[in-house]
Amino acid sequence: VGTSIEITVLRKGLSKAKIFKIVREIIEITSVKTKLINNEIGYLRLTAFNENSSNQLKKEISKIEKNKKLIGYILDLRNNPGGLLSQAVEISDFFLNDGEIVSTKGRKKRDNRKFFAKEGDKINGKPLIVLINNGSASASEIVAGALQDQKRAVLLGETTFGKGSVQII
């Protein structure tokens, strides 16, 4: 970040090269898009589970929660290929007060883990619908499954991709 590089470009038909200086910056990928439907439904679109997804979603939910007419939420996980397990756990926890979110089973017993929700449903118990399709994979399936298993959300859509797994590299 902050470092620069100079690129010299010689265009066809021109005799003089042009020099461009490019400075590196942090690029934050936005994986959360939100809107209010009819001023009463919070629509949360999650396109991936990257390292900033939970922070972005938390910020957007707190903005939407200020609306006094809000009656429920739609969490759209369609065509979300997944991403980081840690983000799937944090995002699931936003909508749960307790219960198991997911467990992982490794080749060695010490790699087996269980992840549980902490108290504090960020949407205060409002109804939640989760949209899924065959493009919902991996972390998307973990979130959808956890919310369904805990009877916290209704899933609507198609059968998911069927990955529902975690790889550690």
Protein language model regions, located:
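Cleft-lining beta-strand/loop regions that shape enzyme active-site pockets
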Residues: V1-I169
